[in-house]
């Protein structure tokens, strides 16, 4: 019978991870899972953040364990059914259910659909950046790109396309009003979010290369397998025009192959969390969640 109790244990682990994905990671998809499985092992975070994740999952694991064991205890106490026979069927059904639920929350169905779907978008619309002619002006301007992690237009006021009566990001909303913005609606909506550009590295790559990030479960990025090696990106174009390029971020750039991408495409000088400690911009033991908080990052920049 021990094998069936192991199945029960595995089911509760799956239910816990499913709960974490659904309530904490929210819109995590299978493309993202595969990408980070292959490329996200370095710079994943400090021990504090890992402990917080474990605590969140452990709470639900204990709760789900009590709930899933309860039917077995009821059957045993009231002798409603043959206990061994019930446990065998029950644990198998529970494992199947928890597996399907986990895959559903990771949007495996969408992953399969998009993998099988055929499209002519590249034949009709894609412009090969290696062949595109880009001419820099005689007087070149400075270019500063600021990426905001986990920021979305749903936080602005309903009047301008958000979901709140009072804006949660009034300063950013003012910037939207007073400057050029791009939207897929008649209000402030931002671009239409596509699956492979909905996570950090996917967004960085797609916005700087007009190309989706390469996702391969068994072939992560490395010095031998360079990200988008044959694609000319914004960094490549700027480097050709003698720009001095820097990537400044508050977390380790080794996570998800970020450093490999920016080194290959533009040979950026990378100033990340580890480099800031090395240059003594921050103390050796300085840590705010994943690294350096935005306010201090702007001061360093």
Q: Where is each model-derived feature located?
A:
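Transmembrane and membrane-interface helices of multi-pass
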Residues: 1-114
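Soluble catalytic regions of membrane-associated enzymes that act on cell-envelope
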Residues: 90, 101, 105-301
């Amino acid at each position: 019978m021990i094998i069936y109790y192991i199945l029960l244990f595995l089911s509760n682990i799956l239910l816990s991870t499913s709960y974490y994905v659904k309530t904490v990671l929210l819109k995590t998809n299978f493309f993202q899972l595969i990408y980070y499985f292959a490329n996200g092992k370095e710079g994943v975070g400090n021990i504090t953040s890992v402990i917080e994740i474990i605590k969140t999952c452990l709470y639900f694991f204990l709760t789900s364990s009590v709930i899933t064991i309860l039917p077995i205890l009821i059957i045993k106490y009231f002798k409603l059914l043959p206990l061994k026979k019930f446990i065998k069927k029950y644990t198998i059904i529970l494992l199947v259910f928890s597996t399907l639920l986990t895959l559903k929350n990771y949007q495996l169905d969408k992953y399969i659909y998009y993998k099988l779907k055929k499209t002519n978008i590249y034949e009709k619309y894609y412009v090969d950046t290696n062949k595109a002619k880009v001419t820099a002006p005689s007087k070149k301007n400075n270019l500063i790109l600021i990426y905001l992690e986990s920021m979305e237009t749903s936080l602005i006021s309903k009047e301008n396309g958000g979901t709140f009566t009072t804006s949660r990001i009034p300063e950013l909303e003012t910037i939207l009003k007073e400057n050029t913005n791009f939207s897929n609606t008649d209000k402030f909506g931002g671009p239409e979010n596509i699956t492979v550009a909905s996570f950090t590295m996917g967004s960085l790559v797609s916005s700087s290369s007009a190309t989706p990030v390469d996702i391969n479960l068994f072939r992560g990025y490395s010095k031998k397998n360079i990200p988008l090696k044959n694609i000319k990106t914004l960094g490549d174009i700027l480097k050709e025009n003698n720009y001095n390029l820097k990537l400044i971020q508050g977390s380790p750039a080794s996570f998800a192959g970020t450093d490999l991408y920016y080194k290959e495409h533009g040979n950026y000088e990378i100033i990340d969390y580890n480099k800031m400690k090395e240059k003594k911009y921050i103390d050796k033991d300085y840590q705010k969640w994943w690294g350096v908080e935005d306010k201090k990052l702007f001061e360093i920049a």
